[in-house]
C-alpha cells in the first residue's frame, strides 16, 4: 500500500526521514473524550475490543485528534489466552482477572495453539475496517503480547507487582513452562500473520513484565520465544518492547527485529552504544512528564529528540499513557516532536 505519510515505516527500516515520526502506547483510550463517549455506551472494555466497527473507530481517533503518525489497532494482549481457551474478565479499576488459571500439564494440554488464531476474526475485521477508513493516510500497527508476559497472567490470574506465582512456576516446573510458552508462541505467530494479512503494516511485541526476571531466565523463558515469533513473521517491520529488560539490550544487537523499544529508565546514549547503530530505537519519555506544563513538556521532548538524533528513532513514551493524562498535554508532546524532530 502507498501511504501519504510513511515516516514510521521508513524510520523503522533505518531509511532517511525528514522528521522523527511519533505515536503513543495507549493513544486510543481514556485520555480521549471521544473514546469515552464510545466506551460508555457498552458493557465494558471487552465488548469494545470484540466489536470490529467500534474498535476500528477508536483506533483511528488518535490520528484525527492527536495527529500521530500511525494508528495501532485497539485490542488487548490477553485476547490470545482467551482464544486459547482461558477466558478473562476486565474488572473496572482493577484490570484483567482470570477466573481459572493454569496449574497443571492437563490445563496446558487443553489449550489451543495455532488454531487459537481462528477465534480472533474480530481483530482482523477491525484491522481491515480501520485500514480501509484510513485510506493510506498513515500505517496501522498490529501487536501481541510476548509469550512470557502472557504466561505471567495465565499463571498469576491477574496483574501483580512481583508475579511471584509465575516466577515460581519457571523455577519449579520449567518443562511445563516451556510447553506453555511453546503453545503461546505458536498461537501468537498465527495471530500476527493474520494481522499482517488484514493490513497491519508493522507490529510490536509487548513484553510488559520482562523486568521481573533475572537475565538468564529472561533469555531462556522470554527472549528465545520472541525471537521465534519475529523470525516467523518477517514480512513487515518488527518492534520489540521489553519493559525493564535493560540487562539484555546487547542481545538486540543481532536480533531479528528492526526497532527496539526503550522504557524511560534506559539511558538513551548508553542504549544507542549497546544496541548499535543498525537498529531503530523507540521511546522513551516518562509518561509522568506529561503532567508538566506545556512549556516544560516541549523542553523535555526536545531533550529526548536531541539525545536520539533525527534518524533511526520513533518518538514515543517509555510506556503507555496514563488514563488521567490531559489530552492537550498529549497533543503538546506530539506537536513538539513534529516541530523539533525536523531534520536539519
Curated annotation (Swiss-Prot):
GO CC field: cytosol
Top-level taxon in the UniProt lineage: Bacteria
Pathway stated in the Swiss-Prot or TrEMBL entry: Porphyrin-containing compound metabolism; protoporphyrin-IX biosynthesis; coproporphyrinogen-III from 5-aminolevulinate: step 4/4
Class of this enzyme: lyase
Signal peptide: none
Catalytic reactions on record: uroporphyrinogen III + 4 H(+) = coproporphyrinogen III + 4 CO2
EC assignment: 4.1.1.37
Site-annotated residues for Transition state stabilizer: 76
Positions of substrate binding: 26-30, 76, 153, 208, 319
InterPro entries: UROD/MetE-like_sf, Uroporphyrinogen_deCO2ase_HemE, Uroporphyrinogen_deCOase
UniProt-listed GO biological process terms: protoporphyrinogen IX biosynthetic process
GO MF entry, a single one: uroporphyrinogen decarboxylase activity
Principal cellular location given in the protein's record: cytoplasm
UniProt-annotated location(s): Cytoplasm
Keywords annotated in UniProt: Cytoplasm, Decarboxylase, Lyase, Porphyrin biosynthesis
Family designation: Belongs to the uroporphyrinogen decarboxylase family.
HAMAP family, per database record: URO_D (MF_00218)
Assembly: Homodimer.
Function comment: Catalyzes the decarboxylation of four acetate groups of uroporphyrinogen-III to yield coproporphyrinogen-III.
Protein name: Uroporphyrinogen decarboxylase
Biological source species: Cytophaga hutchinsonii (strain ATCC 33406 / DSM 1761 / CIP 103989 / NBRC 15051 / NCIMB 9469 / D465)
Gene that specifies this protein: hemE
